[in-house]
Amino acid sequence: MALENLLHPTNIKIDEYAKNATKFSFEALERGVGYTLGFALKQTMLYSIAGACVTSIKINDGKVTSLEDVIPCDETVADIILNVKSLPVTLAEGVETGTITFELSGSEEEIFSEEAKLSEGLAITEEVFICSYNGGKKLKIEAKVEKGVGFRPAQDNFKDGEFLLDATFSPVVFCDFEIKDARVGRRTDLDKLELNIKTNGNVNCEEALRLAATKIQNQLRNIVDIEEINKGIFVEDPTKDINPILLKHVEELNLTARSSNCLKAVNIRLIGELVQKTENELLKAPNFGKKSLTEIKDKLSELGLSLGTLIENWPQDL
């Protein structure tokens, strides 16, 4: 079959069946294309769209150190953590971190997210119940908000007075797809793709789908078609002048699990990315300590490399 004769979806339906929840259907697609598109869009929405979320919580300036500690409200420490973690948050462009603070004192009252003090550039997009405060003793809750992409597991449960949380940065909280049969004229061997998307409200479902499709399109834009390849049109390898060691993955340094996880948390994948970081930049990474720094410096030294190295013409899209 000629490529120009492949079907494209012309029947597109959008069903916003609940708040921040939409079902999209696309038909008709060639057999197998529905699954290919559905899987790619799902994975991209869940793991490749940037967002912000609560990553750690401190209660009473770090004096509350256990989930079993007693606090002056009806909820447990675990309840408070879950409620604060569920806050849908956004950070303004150029703002990478923020802080949410609740300072409670006085009489009994129910506390909602609208009563929080927010750092500059931070916003909570929906009202969320936090706790039923019993009055009397003071209660202070501080939450750190960060930007990121995908999922980042917490390396510890509690450190330096903070409860550390698994971070899910994507504004898409659920995405799944289903493939059904479709027909066009006499052809019955076609696909209908149904995508079910739910977001936390920071972006709407249509915007999330558009972002995912655009990301996939950008990943594919440098792949030329067969005719262009036959004409001898090739994309120059941007890594041809770079030391091959720098293009290896950091896993090949055989670091301890703790050091490896710290590098993953800040999206350092290649040795070349690592050596361009300074000691101070690495020490600012979550859970990154001097022991990990020493280990990394020793491993790099064995290869004749060091931190703080400037690499000219380092490709930004490896």
Swiss-Prot record:
Q: Which UniProt keywords apply?
A: DNA-directed RNA polymerase, Nucleotidyltransferase, Transcription, Transferase
Catalyzed chemical reaction(s): RNA(n) + a ribonucleoside 5'-triphosphate = RNA(n+1) + diphosphate
Ranges for the region named Alpha C-terminal domain (alpha-CTD) are 242-318
Query: InterPro entries, per this entry?
Result: DNA-dir_RNA_pol_insert (IPR011262), DNA-dir_RNA_pol_RpoA/D/Rpb3 (IPR011263), DNA-dir_RpoA (IPR011773), RBP11-like (IPR036603), RNAP_asu_C (IPR011260), RNApol_insert_sf (IPR036643)
Q: What class of enzyme is it?
A: transferase
SMART domains on file: RPOLD
- Cite a GO CC annotation: cytoplasm
Q: Which NCBIfam families match?
A: PRK05182.1-2, rpoA
Quaternary assembly: Homodimer. The RNAP catalytic core consists of 2 alpha, 1 beta, 1 beta' and 1 omega subunit. When a sigma factor is associated with the core the holoenzyme is formed, which can initiate transcription.
Protein role: DNA-dependent RNA polymerase catalyzes the transcription of DNA into RNA using the four ribonucleoside triphosphates as substrates.
> Of which family is this protein a member?
Belongs to the RNA polymerase alpha chain family.
The free-text domain remark for this protein reads: The N-terminal domain is essential for RNAP assembly and basal transcription, whereas the C-terminal domain is involved in interaction with transcriptional regulators and with upstream promoter elements.
Q: What protein name is recorded for this chain?
A: DNA-directed RNA polymerase subunit alpha 2
Q: Which organism is it from?
A: Francisella tularensis subsp. novicida (strain U112)
User: What is the gene called?
Assistant: rpoA2
